[in-house]
């Protein structure tokens, strides 16, 4: 295909990937928040689902999760993995797709990264540089 006919891919994927990812995210978040998965670990944790990334063929969904407070992440991931077939079936019922996407659960580390950057910005060396930049303008 000539270059002028190629569509530019956004960082999160195509528009369809983003839309389907958001639909799957809502379905998983609703399922977890309403106690639809009968697992003592999952029932004992409040889990947020900030993002779902879909593969280009929409057959794989990477579900990013974060337990409230960021504690017990390994235990929560194991519980989600153990209940993956049930969650996949429940999501398939809520989402109208040709194929039920396979779910892959990952911990969302954006919060940790944002905190690390915030701490870095508060270091004396960076504060000094920022102060010098504001004095020059």
Swiss-Prot record:
GO terms for cellular component: cytosol. It is found in: Cytoplasm. GO terms for biological process: maturation of SSU-rRNA. Pfam families: RBFA. One of its GO terms (molecular function) is ribosomal small subunit binding. Monomer. Binds 30S ribosomal subunits, but not 50S ribosomal subunits or 70S ribosomes. Belongs to the RbfA family. NCBIfam families: PRK00521.2-5 (NF001802), rbfA (TIGR00082). This is Ribosome-binding factor A.
């Amino acid at each position: 295909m000539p270059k002028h006919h190629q569509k530019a891919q956004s960082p999160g994927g195509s528009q369809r990937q983003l839309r389907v990812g958001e639909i799957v995210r809502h379905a998983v978040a609703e399922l977890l928040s309403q106690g639809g998965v009968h697992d003592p670990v999952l029932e004992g944790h409040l889990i947020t689902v900030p993002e779902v990334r879909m593969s280009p063929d929409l057959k794989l969904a990477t579900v990013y999760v974060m337990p409230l407070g960021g504690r017990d992440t390994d235990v929560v991931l194991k519980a989600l993995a153990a209940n993956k077939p049930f969650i996949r079936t429940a999501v398939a019922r809520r989402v109208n797709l040709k194929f039920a996407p396979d779910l892959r659960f990952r911990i969302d580390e954006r919060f940790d990264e944002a905190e690390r950057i915030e701490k870095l910005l508060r270091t004396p060396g960076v504060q000094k540089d920022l102060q010098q930049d504001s004095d020059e303008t």
